[in-house]
A protein has these predicted regions:
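A short alpha-helical cap/connector motif
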Residues: 1-133, 138-159, 163-194
Length: 194
């Protein structure tokens, strides 16, 4: 997947962990899921990577670093186009893990890690954002969108992961879609990837 062997090695570590934890997620329940790697997956990662390479955004915002799986794809693409990824995470232990992995991959120079409440961190940043990945708890999609929408550049893109899954969050994703549709200057589409 990745041309840089250091990035590829870290990606393989993430994939190994994801396979190991897949069964564990079902047994641990909702609370235990937060300790597991919940990756966007290879297909979505490739799609995001390609989209960034094609659109060449300068400021990329990732809302929900988690353990850094999707951050790896974003940062590798950002390095190629000399862009910056601002990545937001609430849990310090997740951010520490992501920092370590992305440093090992040699991508730290294209990352700005920020720790805290996503809405507060978005509010504190002047923008603009050229590309945004929303990949956090679905109950936060609308508040985050409301905070970042005024800071979205004219050609900006927002990618929101897991719009169909998990089933228990579909009310939140429906509210998010309805909120986006109220903005006449935005276009939206649902893609079934991954």
């Amino acid at each position: 997947m990745f041309s840089d062997p250091k990035v590829q090695s870290v990606f393989e570590e993430y994939e190994t962990r994801a396979k190991r934890e897949k069964d564990l997620m079902g047994r641990e329940g909702f609370e235990g899921r937060d300790k597991c790697l919940l990756p966007v997956g290879l297909d979505v990662g490739r799609f995001l990577h390609s989209l960034i390479l094609a659109r060449k955004p300068k400021r990329i915002l990732e809302v929900g670093t988690s353990y850094g799986y999707s951050t790896l794809f974003l940062a590798d693409a950002a390095r190629t186009i000399n862009a910056k990824v601002i990545t937001l995470e609430l849990a310090d232990y997740k951010q520490d893990h992501a920092k370590d992995k992305l440093h090992t991959a040699g991508l730290s120079g294209h990352l700005d890690f920020r720790l805290g409440d996503a809405v507060e961190l978005i509010d504190a940043d002047p923008g603009p954002f050229d590309f945004v990945l929303l990949d956090i708890w679905k109950s936060l999609y609308v508040p985050c969108f409301t905070a970042l929408y005024p800071k979205l550049s004219d050609e900006g893109i927002i990618a929101a992961d897991n719009m169909y899954y998990p089933a228990g969050t579909l009310e939140y994703t429906r509210l998010y879609r309805e909120t986006v549709l109220t903005k006449s200057d935005l276009q939206t589409t649902l893609l079934s990837i991954g």
